[in-house]
Amino acid sequence: MIKVVFMGTPDFSVPVLRRLIEDGYDVIGVVTQPDRPVGRKKVLTPTPVKVEAEKHDIPVLQPLRIREKDEYEKVLALEPDLIVTAAFGQIVPNEILEAPKYGCINVHASLLPELRGGAPIHYAIMEGKEKTGITIMYMVEKLDAGDILTQVEVEIEERETTGSLFDKLSEAGAHLLSKTVPLLIQGKLEPIKQNEEEVTFAYNIKREQEKIDWTKTGEEVYNHIRGLNPWPVAYTTLAGQVVKVWWGEKVPVTKSAEAGTIVAIEEDGFVVATGNETGVKITELQPSGKKRMSCSQFLRGTKPEIGTKLGENA
């Protein structure tokens, strides 16, 4: 039986681990990030992958830094035939990558060489792509740069969010891995080098990227809101207060107004001018210190005026 070590951390990784178990591989160990404090009460919380591994009585390693010798030697001591990673969250050292008989392969949520990095799902939507996918490739120490083994495309729907696409890609990754591993073991795959001229990056989202730039087109603002839903959530300011924007709709704007200005107030939301003739009607938001709510609910208690400028003093 093929001995596999799985390395992964978030919810995205869980279906991949589950599929390895269902397909009958001997998952002899799981490597995941350390437990972290979560929420306002800072409750020490295990990763989703750790929770899944413990359901199956699989030993779990949680290195703070996998590149340290005493940590990676614990992985090597398991003597895996194959290592599979999916959103592990740390750069894996060569000592591990070169050890398994069948190598170390990664399940990545984009069509490489596009969108290398830690936030490919967010960027696929924020950039307005109509499709993305899963790539399974050999791991190298350079970020997501290994030779490609298999790929599958996944359509991005008009109202897709990062949350819904995350779920689709997670399942697609598990399914593709199930088809890839047997072919890899049988030596039936021809690895393909990535074209470095086509490389783009999707680095982890920074706080300053979350703010809505109303000078962009309505389409770009709409994609920005979708791409940051449900985390970390796009934001703007209204009357000097931070407001998270959970959802909006593209609407035509007939009169010209400065980008970021409220040009219409309707029962279910207010329309904001952008950098072109497509406005964005905010329909779901979250004022600072309050719960997420519909814009109609918000408007019952707060009455912004037409001409109010959003995005100032953030």
UniProtKB/Swiss-Prot annotation:
Keyword Cytoplasm: no
GO (cellular component) term, any one: cytosol
Coiled coil: none
One Pfam family it belongs to: Formyl_trans_N
Top-level lineage group: Bacteria
Reaction catalysed by this enzyme: L-methionyl-tRNA(fMet) + (6R)-10-formyltetrahydrofolate = N-formyl-L-methionyl-tRNA(fMet) + (6S)-5,6,7,8-tetrahydrofolate + H(+)
Annotated binding of (6S)-5,6,7,8-tetrahydrofolate, by residue: S110, L111, L112, P113
InterPro entries, per database record: Fmt (IPR005794), Formyl_trans_C (IPR005793), Formyl_trans_C_sf (IPR037022), Formyl_transf_N (IPR002376), Formyl_transf_N_sf (IPR036477), Formyl_transferase-like_C_sf (IPR011034), GART_AS (IPR001555), Met-tRNA-FMT_C (IPR044135)
EC numbers: 2.1.2.9
GO molecular function terms listed in the Swiss-Prot or TrEMBL record: methionyl-tRNA formyltransferase activity
Keywords carried by this UniProt record: Protein biosynthesis, Transferase
Homology family: Belongs to the Fmt family.
PANTHER family listed in its UniProt record: METHIONYL-TRNA FORMYLTRANSFERASE, METHIONYL-TRNA FORMYLTRANSFERASE, MITOCHONDRIAL
NCBIfam families: fmt
Known function: Attaches a formyl group to the free amino group of methionyl-tRNA(fMet). The formyl group appears to play a dual role in the initiator identity of N-formylmethionyl-tRNA by promoting its recognition by IF2 and preventing the misappropriation of this tRNA by the elongation apparatus.
Protein known as: Methionyl-tRNA formyltransferase
Organism name: Bacillus thuringiensis subsp. konkukian (strain 97-27)
Gene name of the record: fmt
